[in-house]
Amino acid sequence: MARVKRGVVARARHKKILKQAKGYYGARSRVYRVAVQAVTKAGQYAYRDRRQRKRQFRQLWITRINAAAREHGLSYSCLINGLKKAFIDIDRKMLADIAVFDKPSFAALAKKAKEALL
């Protein structure tokens, strides 16, 4: 059986990892062994945080909607319930955007929600 020299393959693998670790601090960007650990951990954090980002944005939207709703004498849950009863189908992202950038429109939505609750 012929001898297999893997210098080219190893070099390519090392280059790939070190390229991914570019910009890391100290040995994490220069030493292969440390870079492998750093890149692996970074990948785990990225995977986790892609999911957390969705939760955090939803949380932010709800907080903004709640603050705007309370200015109109409603709690967040009452506003959402009122909008559902009034058959106004609008997602939290758009509702939060309206609450921040278009206050008159949000006031109209809050009024409709209040009327639907009565």
UniProtKB/Swiss-Prot annotation:
Signal peptide, first to last residue: none
Function: Binds directly to 23S ribosomal RNA and is necessary for the in vitro assembly process of the 50S ribosomal subunit. It is not involved in the protein synthesizing functions of that subunit.
Gene3D superfamilies reported for this sequence: 6.10.160.10, Ribosomal protein L20
Annotated protein name in UniProt: Large ribosomal subunit protein bL20
Source domain of life: Bacteria
HAMAP family recorded: Ribosomal_bL20 (MF_00382)
SUPFAM superfamilies for this protein: Ribosomal protein L20
Nucleotide-binding recorded as keyword: no
Keywords of the record: Ribonucleoprotein, Ribosomal protein, RNA-binding, rRNA-binding
The organism's taxonomic lineage, starting at the top: Bacteria, Pseudomonadati, Pseudomonadota, Gammaproteobacteria, Enterobacterales
One BP term from GO: ribosomal large subunit assembly
Family: Belongs to the bacterial ribosomal protein bL20 family.
Gene Ontology cellular component terms for the protein in this record: ribonucleoprotein complex; ribosome
GO MF: rRNA binding; structural constituent of ribosome
Pfam families found in the cross-reference section: Ribosomal_L20
Record keyword Cytoplasm present: no
